[in-house]
Curated annotation (Swiss-Prot):
Free-text disruption phenotype from the record: Cells show no aggregation after 11.5 hr of starvation under submerged conditions in contrast to the wild-type. Cells developed on agar exhibit 2 hr delay in aggregation and the aggregation streams formed after 9 hr are larger than normal leading to over-sized mounds. No significant difference in the time of conversion of mounds to migrating slugs, but the larger slugs formed by the mutant cells often subdivide before forming normal-sized fruiting bodies with an apparently normal proportion of spores and stalk.
Coiled coil: none
GO biological process: aggregation involved in sorocarp development; cell aggregation; regulation of DNA-templated transcription; response to imidacloprid; response to starvation; socially cooperative development; sorocarp morphogenesis; sporulation resulting in formation of a cellular spore
Encoding gene (name): srsA
Intracellular or extracellular location(s): Cell membrane
Provenance organism: Dictyostelium discoideum
Record has Disulfide bond as a keyword: no
Name of the protein in question: Starvation responsive small protein A
Membrane topology label: Single-pass membrane protein
Length: 106
């Protein structure tokens, strides 16, 4: 009887079953995470749905910002990392090389 059930399932059915399983597992994970956060046992970031992302972008577009302005602002925020100049790297390299040569002579 079980063999007949497996034979009657088509590849499309397998794909649907796998997708349904993945989606339900994701939903269980989100519910579990929210319950743990409510209990205070886990201090994780609360789940934010994908709809929130689009609402935020839509609100920015309504305010008069176009998509290129939004992307430029994101890039500016990411560029705040401190960079070391090439000359500073050369100085550090020369100093380390001198120290190594002094240690090697001793």
């Amino acid at each position: 009887m079980i063999a007949k059930v497996f034979k009657s399932i088509t590849p499309e059915s397998y794909i649907l079953l796998v997708n349904a399983g993945l989606i339900s597992a994701y939903g269980v994970r989100i519910i579990f995470q929210s319950v743990k956060n409510d209990e205070g046992k886990v201090d994780e970031k609360a789940h934010i749905g994908i709809g929130h992302f689009f609402k935020k972008r839509g609100a920015q577009l309504v305010d008069g910002k176009n998509l290129t302005d939004i992307l430029k602002e994101k890039k500016k925020k990411k560029k705040k990392k401190k960079k070391i100049n090439i000359s500073n790297k050369l100085i550090i390299f020369k100093i380390s090389r001198q120290l190594y040569s002094k240690l090697k002579l001793k």
